[in-house]
């Protein structure tokens, strides 16, 4: 739900959708947090924690970062991924991340769920790019290893595995806005990037006055005015200063990526 509200805000400009997403995230953090930055399903999880709950919040934090550029959300997404790696790791290499770290009963040991592993690949691969951290790329690769086994990949309704494989093997479209948050042109470029939001896309905003470590390792030229860059796995655009040009820039990059 949080990710859906973020997408609605991005493409429509509905600020109330972002407010709802942020309130939902705050409520879950307040009432469902676990030690170690995971999340529980209810007030008590007799058989938990469950992979799906922390995975959903990791996805939510990453989408909130994408629309707000608030790096606190990016850090929270990373902590969720760390919890997943620590608590739901495959019981054997290539066996898939398990749904729960606790047996539901003696006859039903923890097992992997295909859809959860698909979602994990897509989340972890995007996060790996967003923070330039190989640990999350390895997390995605391990989940993909399970999905690629013939007994899993050839089951009916396997289109999600193709999406996961595509996300894991290709870098997301990477839009970066350079400019101070109070500069009208930088704000307009960010809004244009949100309205043109594509699947498997990362939006980053760099404030020249912010000297904290950057999440990604892509270098850009120093400019004396706000600008937007769009990068693929192989190239970056020239700086764009006109918000109205952004949709066409994204469409062209999507075409070249296919």
Locations of the language-model features?
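Glycan-recognition and catalytic cores of secretory/periplasmic carbohydrate-active enzymes
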Residues: 1-258
């Amino acid at each position: 739900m949080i990710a859906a509200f973020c997408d609605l805000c991005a493409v429509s400009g509905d600020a109330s959708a972002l407010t709802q997403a942020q309130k939902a995230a705050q409520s879950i953090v307040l009432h469902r947090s676990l030690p170690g930055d995971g999340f529980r399903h209810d007030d008590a999880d007799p058989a938990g924690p469950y992979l799906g709950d922390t995975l959903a919040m990791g996805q939510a934090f990453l989408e909130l970062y994408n629309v707000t550029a608030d790096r606190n959300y990016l850090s929270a997404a990373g902590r969720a991924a760390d919890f997943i790696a620590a608590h739901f790791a495959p019981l054997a290499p290539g066996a898939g991340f398990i749904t729960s770290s606790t047996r539901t009963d003696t006859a039903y040991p923890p097992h992997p769920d295909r859809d959860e592993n698909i979602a994990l690949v897509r989340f972890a691969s995007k996060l790996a790019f967003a923070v330039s951290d190989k640990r999350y790329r390895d997390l995605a690769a391990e989940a993909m290893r399970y999905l690629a086994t013939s007994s899993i990949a050839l089951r009916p309704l396997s289109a999600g595995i193709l999406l996961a494989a595509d996300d894991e093997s290709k870098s997301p479209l990477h839009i970066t806005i350079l400019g101070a948050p109070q500069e009208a042109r930088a704000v307009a470029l960010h809004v244009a990037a949100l309205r043109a939001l594509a699947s498997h896309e990362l939006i980053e905003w760099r404030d020249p006055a912010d000297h904290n470590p950057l999440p990604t390792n892509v270098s850009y030229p120093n400019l004396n005015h706000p600008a937007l860059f769009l990068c693929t796995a192989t190239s970056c655009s020239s700086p764009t200063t006109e918000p109205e040009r952004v949709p066409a820039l994204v469409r062209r990059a999507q075409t070249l990526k296919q």
